[in-house]
């Protein structure tokens, strides 16, 4: 099945502690999760690694969100939207379901 949410898509979070926030997808994981820039920030405790020159301490980073909890953001309607697939000129393309515009 083709991915409805892909890397560099602008998405909006539908559920969870980051509900309503928008961001760009930085990574799509194979287990059905996505990492969104600036969303679902966690604080991780890291040990120092002197051999690599890494300092220890508290590090803030983005955690993965299930793909069902995000929706693609449609800039024309300024709302979350659903994605459909269709063939145009022999190529499979994604489009917004609300206004039939190609993504």
Curated annotation (Swiss-Prot):
Residue spans crossing the bilayer: none
One GO CC term, this protein: ribosome
Signal peptide: none
Pfam families reported for this sequence: KOW, ribosomal_L24
Keywords: Ribonucleoprotein, Ribosomal protein, RNA-binding, rRNA-binding
Any one GO MF annotation of this record: rRNA binding
Superkingdom of the source species: Bacteria
Keyword set includes RNA-binding: yes
Biological process, per Gene Ontology: translation
Function: One of two assembly initiator proteins, it binds directly to the 5'-end of the 23S rRNA, where it nucleates assembly of the 50S subunit. One of the proteins that surrounds the polypeptide exit tunnel on the outside of the subunit.
HAMAP family per the UniProt record, alphabetical: Ribosomal_uL24_B
Family that this chain belongs to: Belongs to the universal ribosomal protein uL24 family.
Subunit structure: Part of the 50S ribosomal subunit.
The protein's name in its UniProt record: Large ribosomal subunit protein uL24
